[in-house]
Amino acid sequence: KRRPPGFTPFR
């Protein structure tokens, strides 16, 4: 899977 730069599933 590819995630965009700065992808934050958790903060």
Curated annotation (Swiss-Prot):
One of its GO terms (molecular function) is toxin activity. One of its GO terms (biological process) is defense response. Expressed by the venom gland. GO terms for cellular component: extracellular region. It is found in: Secreted. It comes from the Eukaryota. Keywords: Bradykinin receptor impairing toxin, G-protein coupled receptor impairing toxin, Hypotensive agent, Secreted, Toxin, Vasoactive, Vasodilator. Pfam families: Bradykinin. Belongs to the bradykinin-related peptide family. Induces relaxation of arterial smooth muscle, by targeting bradykinin receptors (BDKRB). May cause hypotension. This is Wasp kinin PMM1. It comes from Polistes major.
